[in-house]
């Protein structure tokens, strides 16, 4: 069976293959002769990085999982300054992390082509917001390409390298959840000889302080260069192979569709049976090419702009039309919603209203049927996996802390601790935010902490932050230093499951693994000690009693306590055992001992445990049990017994 990673490296120009959008981006980078790739994983961009990790050594590409997006951007940037083609990929909020360097570098430019892939998440399927990268690019005056198909996702990367080098400026490839994760036909192009031979490429950095040092005297003239360069891109995009006009030349109405919205518009027009509309397909939402706009607007009386999220194209078109004195009725966000992702339904409804047509489908009737289905189908909220070590950590923490404890948390699987029965997540904002929020609360609630001590005598802390291992290295370190330096009074629990689990089991500095072989492992507890934390301990969350006792000690210490809860991600570990042909333990309920107290369900909440309403007993689904033994530790009646031995 052929692996996708083999297909991505196929030396078969003209071959038609099926690829994920993110996999196609990697193929495009290889066809573009990439030399360096660096990224921090983040959904929906993660498969780009994982695919590159799988092929990099064979293709002669230096590839790394960086500690965060800022570091990844700077790594790729410096490779570009040394003359190599380089790429980084991140989710949309990852660009916020890289923003400081990103905005400064916009004035400096690049040498080798530099492509910044940013995967937006309209509808927030796995993100905390749905910010539009096109708006950020417009603010920064950085050009944006946006694919409408998997084929374009591949082809645009090579094109981006070329125009980046031509004009000496980085280029953003903006994708979305759908364009990242859709599959489609891709016709493979030619691979460069260096990629086929797997030869590492090395560059040459030529010193030029006036360009590369960002003191005001050097930077001041570059703003003008930035503005002049974006206009060169605008001119370039008039002839871009990813922009075109289709439909009858004598049409009176037109639709502008950037990126993936083009695919929805084409489907919507087919649904509506409309063929007398002119369509401007835009693969370059910023800057919009004015020459192409002039051609498109000829003979039109009304125009609709169909785009996801912010009116980035709409605003550019309206400003251009106003400045040109063009008297054409232009619609956009008055008909197309500004929130959530584009769908065929949304495109159909907007275009139908624009054209004064009835929709071919009764969507209201579908909505009513959907509501009825929702009433029948049991809800399936997300849950921590069976045997997830975080469940045990949360259970022990909640038991050890005062009832009034506050739990700032972070971005990762463990955010699911917000749900019952664990309820040990009170705030999340961004990667690394847990420690900063915990510190701020300790300052704001210092009097409350003293009062709590007097009332309960239960610990010197009421604030316990939780943060994952990868997140700790991502942006937790500065916040920890700040908390220690400013004598905060918090407990920080680092949930170390020995992998970057939520985005697909990628390595991080705490694992010591890299795509090219062993790296140097950095132990979280040693970092905390070196920073001067007042209490540092490491626990195995599969030992709930030990974890509980350690939390009690940590909560008694005045100052910053750091507890590292270390145990491999259960999902990752089970995968290892399956591949090795080994089995894991399984537990079952001894019905003679079970009293039906429901502590295992109402306080612990493992999804492998369910309630038998007839027998009024707890039961374990053997197909879901992964044998951590947490249930046996929390049951006060010893009703859970191991029925199969194994490793975990």
Swiss-Prot record:
Entry binding sites for [4Fe-4S] cluster 2: 606, 625, 628, 631
CDD domains noted in UniProt: TPP_IOR_alpha (cd02008), TPP_PYR_PFOR_IOR-alpha_like (cd07034)
Keyword Metal-binding tagged: yes
Catalytic reaction equation(s): indole-3-pyruvate + 2 oxidized [2Fe-2S]-[ferredoxin] + CoA = (indol-3-yl)acetyl-CoA + 2 reduced [2Fe-2S]-[ferredoxin] + CO2 + H(+)
UniProtKB keywords: 4Fe-4S, Electron transport, Iron, Iron-sulfur, Metal-binding, Oxidoreductase, Repeat, Transport
Top-level class of the enzyme under EC nomenclature: oxidoreductase
UniProt-listed InterPro entries: 4Fe4S_Fe-S-bd, 4Fe4S_Fe_S_CS, HACL1-like, IorA, Pyrv_Fd/Flavodoxin_OxRdtase_N, THDP-binding, TPP_enzyme_TPP-bd, Transketo_C/PFOR_II
Every 4Fe-4S ferredoxin-type domain range: 585-614, 616-645
Binding-site residues for [4Fe-4S] cluster 1, renumbered to this chain: 594, 597, 600, 635
Cofactor note: Binds 2 [4Fe-4S] clusters. In this family the first cluster has a non-standard and varying [4Fe-4S] binding motif CX(2)CX(2)CX(4-5)CP.
Keyword Cell inner membrane recorded: no
Cofactor: [4Fe-4S] cluster
Pfam families, A to Z: Fer4_7, POR_N, TPP_enzyme_C
GO MF annotations in UniProt: 4 iron, 4 sulfur cluster binding; indolepyruvate ferredoxin oxidoreductase activity; metal ion binding; thiamine pyrophosphate binding
One Gene Ontology biological process: organic acid metabolic process
Function description: Catalyzes the ferredoxin-dependent oxidative decarboxylation of arylpyruvates.
Subunit composition and interactions: Heterodimer of the IorA and IorB subunits.
UniProt name for this protein: Indolepyruvate oxidoreductase subunit IorA
Organism for this UniProt entry: Pyrococcus abyssi (strain GE5 / Orsay)
